[in-house]
């Protein structure tokens, strides 16, 4: 017997299957996801937990006329398999292959591009309103995880949807029980009643009755309070009802037949509806289900039989080095606290949580709150460290400026995943942090070149009387022997490679690009090209004397950064050279970095080579600029 999955090239093919075949299809989808993630890595647990929801939604609704909007997109692998991408699915997260998240350009079934949390409800509501304005057919459904519900924008969307009263369907994929459901016979009874025509008519009748009841008489007030109190006791959805939603659930998110039946009944409702589905992250794969910390979230390559990683980096990852250094600082100074936004494992702060539970805060997917919470702590003498991925700090930009930098509060920002992140692609590249932080007054911006520099920069930030940020990359460190942390002079870089006499070119590197720069300089030396190398350390303030001095000696400069070129570190150097009059005097400058585009997913090493950020690319750029200057001099 062949696989049912092999017969599905579109949602129309899915709809031809009998409902009783759907459980078998779900198991086939699970196996395909497990085998693919074992080779490519990916968000295994979330996708396994949402298989039945994906199948039921596509079985009931008609994409792309009906719009299915995924929050974050971790749970959308089954969606990709059901929408014409089955044959390419094993290319997911690889160079030239499918993206790990929904992307509008990839398929007409990907209604909205996602990767960051809590956006689906707002986007879905916008699509629904656009359909109303244009008269276009189709329904809109947002699938949201319970974790995303900790983000403020999710509740902003719920609030507006309830106010407008449109026919929006929100499916809450609750896989961590963060919204505690009332289980048992009473809950099951209410779920069935909430999805019945009788209950819907009764609800409208009661609502109409209560709207005509005067508020004054004491007896009527007692009736009102009694009804509301009863609802609060018997339904976990009172919050959503209060926002204007019809609440349905909780339902079993792994009973695909029941999900189909429930979704088909939702069409009877007028106005917004929230379906609360209870699921298990990692469902159907024991190693993921038994991983209490992450349930198989964001795995790299692993052995299918055990769920264990296939290989480990030779050197310790920067994330782990940061976490250990932070724990040391927390041990030394009781004022130091750690804050993260739903990323205890991802940022390494789980180590701090285990050692200092009272001084480590996971605020949920609430980056704005995390930053202003840190600002409040700093006001009272605490030294907060906000550990966050570079791409997610973007969400709290106003708070960085208004609540921290403007008041010159000593908040430390530790930006993980600064630079290229590999398989997670466009939505997760740490491309913009240097550009968006260096323009903020009072803020110090640093980037370490190795593990010791990271330790020094954390130590420096915690001893600085003002806000400071440092960014470090995804992946393994250089494997250097660790030193005791030191306070670095603010705005002082170092000459990492000096040359006798006058250099032909000066390479100014930020962060871990230093090592490729040094390798390029060694290769250039064999060709008779003398290259000095500056480890900038600081993107703001720049070490103006060092950088401008070396530039003036060499008359040719190549800057390197693993960040966006517009407004980035190289642009800061160019501004310095312009202020010093070096550009007018004929200084040649070449800036290497990430182009003015969203860099897609792929292998980090290959992408660096393609962008000219490896040793060969840097050497080519140096030869070219030295050659141009020589030609110009000869002319």
From Swiss-Prot:
Keywords: Isoprene biosynthesis, Magnesium, Metal-binding, Thiamine biosynthesis, Thiamine pyrophosphate, Transferase. Pathway: Metabolic intermediate biosynthesis; 1-deoxy-D-xylulose 5-phosphate biosynthesis; 1-deoxy-D-xylulose 5-phosphate from D-glyceraldehyde 3-phosphate and pyruvate: step 1/1. The keyword Metal-binding applies. Thiamine diphosphate binds at residues 74, 115-117, 147-148, 175, 285, 367. Its cofactor is Mg(2+); thiamine diphosphate. It comes from the Bacteria. Binds 1 Mg(2+) ion per subunit. Binds 1 thiamine pyrophosphate per subunit. GO terms for cellular component: cytosol. Mg(2+) binds at residues 146, 175. Catalyzes the acyloin condensation reaction between C atoms 2 and 3 of pyruvate and glyceraldehyde 3-phosphate to yield 1-deoxy-D-xylulose-5-phosphate (DXP). Homodimer. This is 1-deoxy-D-xylulose-5-phosphate synthase. The lineage of its organism: Bacteria, Pseudomonadati, Myxococcota, Myxococcia, Myxococcales. The gene is dxs.
């Amino acid at each position: 017997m062949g696989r049912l999955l092999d017969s599905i090239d579109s949602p129309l093919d899915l709809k031809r299957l009998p409902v009783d075949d759907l459980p078998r299809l779900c198991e086939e989808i699970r196996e395909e996801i497990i085998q693919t993630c074992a080779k490519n890595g990916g968000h295994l647990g979330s996708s396994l937990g949402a298989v039945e929801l994906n199948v039921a939604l596509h079985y009931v609704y008609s994409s792309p006329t009906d719009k299915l909007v995924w929050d974050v997109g971790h749970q959308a692998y089954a969606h990709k398999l059901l929408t014409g991408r089955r044959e390419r699915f094993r290319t997911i997260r690889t160079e030239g292959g499918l993206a790990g998240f929904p992307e509008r350009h990839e398929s007409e079934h990907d209604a909205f591009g996602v990767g960051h949390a809590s956006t689906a409800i707002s986007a879905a509501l916008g699509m629904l309103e656009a359909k109303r304005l244009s008269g276009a057919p189709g329904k809109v459904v947002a699938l949201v995880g319970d974790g995303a519900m900790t983000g403020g924008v999710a509740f902003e969307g719920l609030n507006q949807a309830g106010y407008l009263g449109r026919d929006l369907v929100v499916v809450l994929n609750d896989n961590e029980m963060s919204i505690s459901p009332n289980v048992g016979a009473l809950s099951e009874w209410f779920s069935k009643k909430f999805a019945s025509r009788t209950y819907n008519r009764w609800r409208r009748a009661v609502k109409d009755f209560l709207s005509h009841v005067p508020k004054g008489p004491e007896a009527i007030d007692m009736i009102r309070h009694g009804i509301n109190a009863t609802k609060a006791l018997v339904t976990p959805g009172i919050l959503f009802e209060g926002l204007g939603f019809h609440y349905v659930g909780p339902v079993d998110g792994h009973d695909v037949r029941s999900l189909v039946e429930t979704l088909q009944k939702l069409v009877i409702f007028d106005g917004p509806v929230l379906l609360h589905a209870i699921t298990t992250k990692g469902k159907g794969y024991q190693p993921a289900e038994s991983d209490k910390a992450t349930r198989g979230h964001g795995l790299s390559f692993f052995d299918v039989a055990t769920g264990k990683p296939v290989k480990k980096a030779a050197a310790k990852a920067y994330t782990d080095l940061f976490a250990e250094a932070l724990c040391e600082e927390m041990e030394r100074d009781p004022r130091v606290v750690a804050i993260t936004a739903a990323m205890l494992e991802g940022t390494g702060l789980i180590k701090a949580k285990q050692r200092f539970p009272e001084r480590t805060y996971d605020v949920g997917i609430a980056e704005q709150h995390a930053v202003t919470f840190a600002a409040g702590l700093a006001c009272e003498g605490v030294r907060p460290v906000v550990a966050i991925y570079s791409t997610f700090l973007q969400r709290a930009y106003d708070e960085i400026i208004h609540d921290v930098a403007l008041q010159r509060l000593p908040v430390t920002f530790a930006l993980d995943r600064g630079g290229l992140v590999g398989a997670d692609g466009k939505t997760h590249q740490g491309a913009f942090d240097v550009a968006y932080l260096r323009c903020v007054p009072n803020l110090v911006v640093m980037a370490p070149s190795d593990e010791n520099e990271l330790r020094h920069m954390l130590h420096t930030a915690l001893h600085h009387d003002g806000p400071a940020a440092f960014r470090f990359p995804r992946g393994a460190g250089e494997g250097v022997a660790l030193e005791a942390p030191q306070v670095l002079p603010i705005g002082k870089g170092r000459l990492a490679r000096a040359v006798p006499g006058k250099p032909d070119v000066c390479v100014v590197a930020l962060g871990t690009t230093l090592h490729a720069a040094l390798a390029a300089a060694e290769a250039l030396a064999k060709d008779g090209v003398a290259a000095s190398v500056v480890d900038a350390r600081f993107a703001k303030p720049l070490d103006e004397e060092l950088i401008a001095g070396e530039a003036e000696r060499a008359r040719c400069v190549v800057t390197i950064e693993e960040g966006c070129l517009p407004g980035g570190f190289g642009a800061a150097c160019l501004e310095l050279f312009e202020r010093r009059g070096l550009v007018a005097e004929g200084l040649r400058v070449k800036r290497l970095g990430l182009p003015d585009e969203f860099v897609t997913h792929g292998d980090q090493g290959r992408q660096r080579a393609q962008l000219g950020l490896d040793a060969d690319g840097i050497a080519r750029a140096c030869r070219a600029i030295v050659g141009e200057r020589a030609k110009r001099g000869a002319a």
